[in-house]
Amino acid sequence: IAVDNYFVNRVDSPRDENGNYDYEALNCIDVKQFNEDMEALLAGKRVELPVYNFVKGEREYKGDFLQLGAEDILVIEGIHCLNDDLSYSLPRDKKFKIYISALTQLNIDDHNRVPTTDGRLVRRMVRDARTRGASAQDTIRMWDSVRRGEERNIFPYQEEADAMFNSAFLYELSVLKQYAEPILYSVPRDSAEYN
């Protein structure tokens, strides 16, 4: 289950110190509804799951139901999943937390590596363009907010993880190039995001 599908409607989203929507904040998630749905699923009930429409900025219900069997495992993904404030109603001893991060292993030369943040930005640009209706310029514009969100909402909780998984692949930038290059070329040269 993607926690992003529990985003509050965009108009109800919190704002940062600059007045911009703060999509990285925990209270951008409808935590109460998320917990109600997760408790119901773990109790074996049939639950209609939301789907967040990133283009409209609204949570929608489209008849996507889920019911867990006695032996099923519930997998939840999202930036706040290591934070127990997200899943306050779920017993800690029933959780196995995995911290997944893309830790790039590529070097430019013998002394300089490809920064992990660069690989994550390319991943995010491709994802946002394919699934969220966002341009590369939009993603780059939001990147500082995303990085602040990592510092506030991910890194402080990484020690809470029961396991760590590196999701980077040596060849992934080569694969992503065919998707990233066209959207990067669409960034206007005279825009702040071009530099």
Question: Can you annotate each of these PLM segments?
Answer:
Residues 81, 85-195:
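Conserved NTP phosphate-binding and transfer environment spanning the P-loop NTPase/kinase superfamily
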Residues 73-77, 99:
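Structural recognition of the conserved hydrophobic beta-strand(s) that form the central parallel beta-sheet
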Residues 54-62, 145-148:
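Short gly/ser/thr-rich secondary-structure transition/capping motifs
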Residues 8, 12-58, 73:
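Conserved nucleotide-sensing/catalytic segment adjacent to the nucleotide-binding pocket
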Residues 10-15, 63, 87, 110-112:
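Short acidic, glycine/serine/threonine-rich loops at helix termini
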Residues 1-5:
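Phosphate-binding active sites in nucleotide-utilizing proteins
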Residues 68-70, 92-93:
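Short loop/turn elements that form and flank the Walker-type P-loop nucleotide-binding site
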